[in-house]
Amino acid sequence: MKLITYVKEGESIDRVLKKCKQKFDKARIIRKLRERQQYIKPSERKRKILAKAKYREFRKLLADD
């Protein structure tokens, strides 16, 4: 995956690095790399998503009280 950042003439290095970091974060490259380090079965992935949703719902109910 390529991340292309255009640099305008006279633009500061700090600004360019900030742009690069934002593009890097938006592309979610780190997240993809971490996910691909080990294989997770689809059923386990689904179970994890459901557990997170259940936890969020529980927290929402506690906040309403």
From Swiss-Prot:
Family designation: Belongs to the bacterial ribosomal protein bS21 family.
The protein's name: Small ribosomal subunit protein bS21
Highest taxon, organism lineage: Bacteria
Record carries keyword Ribosomal protein: yes
Gene coding for it: rpsU
HAMAP family assigned: Ribosomal_bS21
GO MF annotations, alphabetized: structural constituent of ribosome
One protein family per Pfam: Ribosomal_S21
GO CC annotation, single: ribosome
The keyword Ribosomal protein is annotated on this UniProt entry: yes
Lineage: Bacteria, Bacillati, Mycoplasmatota, Mollicutes, Acholeplasmatales
